[in-house]
């Protein structure tokens, strides 16, 4: 199942922001780059206290996910697309458990194609990486 359009990371600018400022978690088949929701320090009327408010409600409201798979993984587009579909399907099942506002990029490693990785393995590794990065809603 494909990710909803509201949950897709599309622009080059967004990908670059995640790579530049995000945290990194490594697994055997995937690498997760995650960028926490954007917050701004806005001064209140009382200068002694500062309040934190979201900069853009668009980025806070939904989680954005992108998948990067290089030709180093496989020269054949059929193989790369199959891996991408399996990861997307696993992410679709995890989507309701994820905290809003995060921007995530999953980078597929060449070991994913070499070991004939299947969907349950991707699901297990995705859960592990997301838990390490504390992306789950309520950090469950």
Swiss-Prot record:
Keyword Nuclease applies: yes
Catalytic activity field: Endonucleolytic cleavage of RNA, removing 5'-extranucleotides from tRNA precursor
GO biological process: tRNA 5'-leader removal
E.C. no: 3.1.26.5
Pfam families on file: Ribonuclease_P
Keywords for the protein's UniProt record, in alphabetical order: Endonuclease, Hydrolase, Nuclease, RNA-binding, tRNA processing
InterPro entries with a match to the protein in the record: Ribosomal_Su5_D2-typ_SF, Ribsml_uS5_D2-typ_fold_subgr, RNase_P
GO MF annotation terms: 3'-tRNA processing endoribonuclease activity; ribonuclease P activity; tRNA binding
Highest taxon in the source lineage: Bacteria
GO cellular component: ribonuclease P complex
Gene3D superfamilies, per database record: 3.30.230.10
Quaternary structure and interacting proteins, as annotated: Consists of a catalytic RNA component (M1 or rnpB) and a protein subunit.
Matches recorded under HAMAP family: RNase_P (MF_00227)
Role this protein plays: RNaseP catalyzes the removal of the 5'-leader sequence from pre-tRNA to produce the mature 5'-terminus. It can also cleave other RNA substrates such as 4.5S RNA. The protein component plays an auxiliary but essential role in vivo by binding to the 5'-leader sequence and broadening the substrate specificity of the ribozyme.
Annotated NCBIfam families: rnpA (TIGR00188)
Family membership: Belongs to the RnpA family.
Name assigned to this protein: Ribonuclease P protein component
Organism (species): Nostoc punctiforme (strain ATCC 29133 / PCC 73102)
């Amino acid at each position: 199942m494909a990710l909803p359009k509201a949950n897709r990371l599309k622009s080059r600018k967004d990908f670059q922001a995640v790579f530049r400022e995000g945290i990194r978690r490594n697994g055997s088949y995937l690498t997760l780059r995650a960028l926490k929701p954007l917050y701004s320090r806005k001064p209140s009327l009382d200068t002694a206290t500062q309040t934190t408010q979201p900069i853009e409600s668009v980025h806070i409201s939904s989680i954005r996910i992108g998948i990067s798979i290089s030709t180093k993984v496989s020269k054949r587009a059929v193989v790369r697309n199959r891996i991408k579909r399996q990861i997307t399907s696993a992410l679709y099942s995890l989507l309701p458990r994820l905290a809003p506002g995060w921007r995530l990029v999953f980078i597929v490693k060449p070991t994913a194609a070499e070991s004939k990785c299947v969907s349950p393995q991707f699901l297990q590794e995705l859960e592990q990486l997301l838990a390490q990065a504390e992306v789950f809603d309520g950090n469950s």
